[in-house]
Amino acid sequence: MKGKRVVLAGFYPPPFAGEPVHVMQLAQLLRDHGLSVQILNLNRQASPSQDYHHSGGRLGLLWRLLTLADRAAILHLHTNGHSRKSWLMILVASLAGRFRDVTAVLTLHSGLLPGYVAGFGTIERRLARWILRPFTRIICANPEICRSVKAIGSVGVQTSVIPAFLGVSHAPELSPQDRTLSEGFRPLLVAVAGGEEDPERGLAVVLRAVQQLVPVHPDLGTILMGWQVGPKTRPLIQELGLADHAVCLGEVSHDRCLALLRASDVVVRSTFVDGDAITVREALAFGVPVVASDTDFRPEGVTLFRRGDVSDLAVKLSHVLAQPTGRDPSRRPAHDQSASMWELYAELLGSENTASGLVQPPPRPAAST
């Protein structure tokens, strides 16, 4: 049986985006099960921290990725898969599996991956197959990513679709400042950006839809947030005359994001591309209605609008806002993937029902409204 040590390699908060939050939550899940977890933060701009290993230099980071895990450990790389930089990381983790006998696991997060690998030529596809072969498991955030990986022609590599959502373990309260902000808007829309090369592109669609809805809902307001959000969005708010109806917070902590999601009347996800948006599932876990663009994949329980279509978004928001506001916990779709993720790890560890002495974690509390 493999040892009880895991090295998780990926971005780690901050920033508070989907992949970093997932890495943080996965580390906690594995520790709850009795595993020793080390984190390699692949963000070269990260500040030093006792929470993770890191390196400000590219070579130093690649060396740590190659050597931090030994043959008794599991190396689990989290990356987007839609850039050369990402595939360099995949290559190095692959080499750790190929030449150092490390159990290597790969999670691919990005909805941009299918389009990226579709552009591979014959040589690139052969190289990609060689790179992916040493991975014991490849986890994909949605089915379309999984189909793209299989289309490369990887032989002998087991793939799984496990959305990057491990539940909501607590329901943070609004700060006094955010409570005042949110109570000034009724109804309150919360829009979270991310998932693509220009995270602000979809927020422009939200703002223009809000502009159409204000005559009908004069107290309506929207709070916009996300990593790398602000430089384009704040000027657009002024340009559209929405200073009294929209606030751009930019990047916020995960707890602050959860509190705002929980307080909202509708959550909007307007990206043009997505892997699996954690915030969508978090909102659904709180019983908050979600209106989201029709990307390749959205979970059960979401109201879809045509991506980029301002009028369709306005129509769908109007429909949702016209519904009763009560939240019925029994109608929430089940999205928590903790059990699926632990089942995969238990298999990798060669342990059924944690017979090796690994503990069962305490049950997670359900997200409250």
Regions found by a protein language model. Give the residues of each.
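Glycosyltransferase donor-sugar binding loop
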Residues: 41-45, 192-196, 221-234, 250
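Nucleotide-activated donor-binding/catalytic signature segment of Leloir-type glycosyltransferases, i.e.
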Residues: 234-252
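Conserved donor-binding/catalytic core segment of Leloir-type glycosyltransferases
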Residues: 7-8, 177-201, 207-210, 223
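Short hydrophobic beta-strand element within catalytic cores of glycosyltransferases
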Residues: 280, 289-292
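A charged, aromatic-enriched C-terminal amphipathic alpha-helix characteristic of glycosyltransferases
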Residues: 322-359
